[in-house]
């Protein structure tokens, strides 16, 4: 089997069962695919290139929350505004796990605020 075939065959999306006491449930939080993460980053980045947390937290909760019994997604995009009315602690609990499982780091959030040419020149200076 080629390396390509091995990579494409592996299940590489991490999961974690998260207890959300504010909601009285456990949610399976899954990491996002590359496409999902890119979509959310594009959607949550304001015109100035800064992360809009009011936008990104519910988007991450929607994208990463699954029913541990059925495997179905818990929320749909139309739930975004109603999620913003829920406990900030609960949203933070789920979103932070979703971000960690999806490779969001402080460094990746900081990169969103940089001009792409600035980032490219920094990357070149690492060589």
Language-model segments: residues:
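Extended acidic low-complexity intrinsically disordered regions
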Residues: 1-14, 126
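Short, surface-exposed, charged amphipathic helix/loop patches that serve as local interaction elements
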Residues: 14, 22-127
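Catalytic micro-motifs at enzyme active sites that drive phosphoryl/nucleotidyl and oxygen chemistry
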Residues: 17
């Amino acid at each position: 089997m080629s390396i390509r075939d091995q990579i494409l065959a592996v299940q590489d999306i991490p999961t974690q069962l998260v207890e959300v006491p504010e909601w009285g449930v456990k949610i399976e939080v899954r990491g996002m695919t590359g496409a999902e993460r890119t979509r959310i980053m594009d959607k949550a980045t304001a015109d100035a290139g800064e992360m809009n947390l009011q936008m990104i937290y519910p988007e991450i909760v929607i994208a990463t929350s699954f029913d541990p019994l059925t495997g179905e997604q818990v929320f749909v995009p139309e739930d975004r505004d109603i999620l913003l009315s829920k406990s900030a602690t609960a949203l933070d609990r789920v979103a932070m796990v979703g971000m960690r499982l999806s490779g969001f780091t402080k460094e990746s959030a900081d990169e969103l605020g940089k001009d792409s040419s600035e980032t490219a020149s920094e990357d070149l200076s690492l060589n």
